[in-house]
Amino acid sequence: MRVLVVEDNALLRHHLKVQIQDAGHQVDDAEDAKEADYYLNEHLPDIAIVDLGLPDEDGLSLICRWRSNDVSLPILVLTARESWQDKVEVLSAGADDYVTKPFHIEEVMARMQALMRRNSGLASQVISLPPFQVDLSRRELSINDEVIKLTAFEYTIMETLIRNNGKVVSKDSLMLQLYPDAELRESHTIDVLMGRLRKKIQAQYPQEVITTVRGQGYLFELR
């Protein structure tokens, strides 16, 4: 696996690089957004770890720009911003997960591995609920044969809901799909991801297909 680390602090960047390499992965380390763009385009990383406090471009702006350019690799954010509002902003920008500073490198590694597990391919199979179609091997959602650009976590939620078409899926079940490691789970993450997912779906399919069932969870149903 190739990991892109975007961090302006040289000591922290080096520490992350060494730890990730010791885990058996290839690492490109960038000190700013310009260098990150280069590695993204030239080396095609599998996942990016992005600090928000970059010298030439705010990390949130970088993530928004990547997502608007259809960059779909998983993004793990490093941030010193601890309020829930800041965390919502990070996820809304297109990040898949975040770690607040100061952090233990073991948590960064665990969250990175969790993201990659969610993003790994499955055996070739398609779930079709016209006009919705989920390609399990490509990890893609299509509506009316048009691919909808989703982040790794958004796709996982959508696949889980479609697999349970017509049945309520609890928030706990979705959290388990996203974070197999219990200590990494934060329930409000689901609400943010669900909001992003609904907006993307409604841009192509205006009818409401994901319903919140109060006190129970979420329901995907075509009417």
Swiss-Prot record:
Q: Where in the cell is it found?
A: Cytoplasm
Which SMART domains does the record cross-reference, listed alphabetically?
REC, Trans_reg_C
Q: What is its main location?
A: cytoplasm
InterPro entries, per this entry?
CheY-like_superfamily (IPR011006), OmpR/PhoB-type_DNA-bd (IPR001867), Sig_transdc_resp-reg_receiver (IPR001789), WalR-like (IPR039420), WH-like_DNA-bd_sf (IPR036388)
Quote the PTM field: Phosphorylated by PhoQ.
Keywords on record: Activator, Cytoplasm, DNA-binding, Phosphoprotein, Repressor, Transcription, Transcription regulation, Two-component regulatory system
A molecular function (GO) held by this record is:
transcription cis-regulatory region binding
State the PANTHER family in the record. Answer: REGULATOR OF RPOS, TRANSCRIPTIONAL REGULATORY PROTEIN PHOP
This chain belongs to which protein, by name? Transcriptional regulatory protein PhoP
* Classification lineage: Bacteria, Pseudomonadati, Pseudomonadota, Gammaproteobacteria, Enterobacterales
